[in-house]
């Protein structure tokens, strides 16, 4: 972890930006065409599970995010495009995510350790508590904590009965 850049290094990218948080809900499919036309107007922060759908539509997210500590390496797209996208991830994510071929990896401070010497050594003394029960919640909290001008959510309908991820998987 000490050899990786911290998510705190991204703060200036969020400051004053219009952030689009993209999740892989089935409604994302209807927004892909419009998103491809306006993608340059947003900092696009996407769930790893939304990446393939975005790449297929010609959309290049600025950042991807993952927070689950379990081995979900099957969720990492086997696509060359990930080499151009930075990955924001929990300090406790499975090693497969740290080893994936993303442009770089930006661990975020574990809320339970913020304020400790370990957190200060990894992220500096002013790291905010970044938390959320889903990657979309965490992404929105992070964007707002880093002074984004606005946060817009797409593809957030994962709890609708019968809905599948836009990539077609479960």
Residue ranges of model-derived segments:
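Acidic, Ser/Thr-rich peripheral helices and adjacent loops at domain boundaries
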Residues: 65-71, 76-85, 106-110, 166-170
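Gly/Ser/Thr-rich loops at beta-strand to alpha-helix junctions
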Residues: 24-28, 51, 133, 158-161
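N-terminal donor/sugar-recognition subdomains of glycan-related enzymes
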Residues: 1-22, 26-43, 52-57, 72-85, ...
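Active-site/ligand-binding-proximal alpha/beta "capping" segment
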Residues: 95-158
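Structural motif
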Residues: 19-23, 44-46, 65, 88, ...
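Glycine-rich phosphate/pyrophosphate-binding loops
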Residues: 48-68, 146-166
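Short, acidic/turn-prone active-site loops that include or flank metal/cofactor-
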Residues: 48-51, 66-73, 90-94, 110-114, ...
């Amino acid at each position: 972890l000490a050899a990786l850049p911290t998510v705190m290094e991204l703060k200036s990218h969020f400051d004053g930006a219009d952030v689009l948080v993209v999740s892989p809900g089935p409604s994302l499919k209807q927004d892909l065409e419009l998103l491809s036309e306006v993608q340059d107007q947003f900092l696009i922060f996407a769930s790893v599970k939304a990446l393939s759908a975005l790449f297929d539509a010609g959309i290049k997210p600025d950042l991807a995010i993952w927070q689950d500590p379990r081995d979900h390496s099957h969720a990492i797209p086997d696509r060359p495009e990930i080499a151009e996208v930075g990955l924001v991830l929990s300090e406790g994510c499975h090693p497969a995510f740290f080893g994936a071929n993303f442009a770089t990896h930006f661990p975020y401070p574990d809320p339970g350790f913020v304020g400790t010497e370990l957190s200060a050594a990894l992220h500096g003394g002013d790291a905010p508590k970044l938390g959320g029960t889903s990657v979309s919640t965490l992404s929105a909290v992070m964007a707002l904590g880093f002074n984004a001008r606005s946060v817009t959510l797409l593809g957030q309908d994962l709890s609708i009965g019968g809905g599948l991820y836009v990539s077609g998987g479960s």
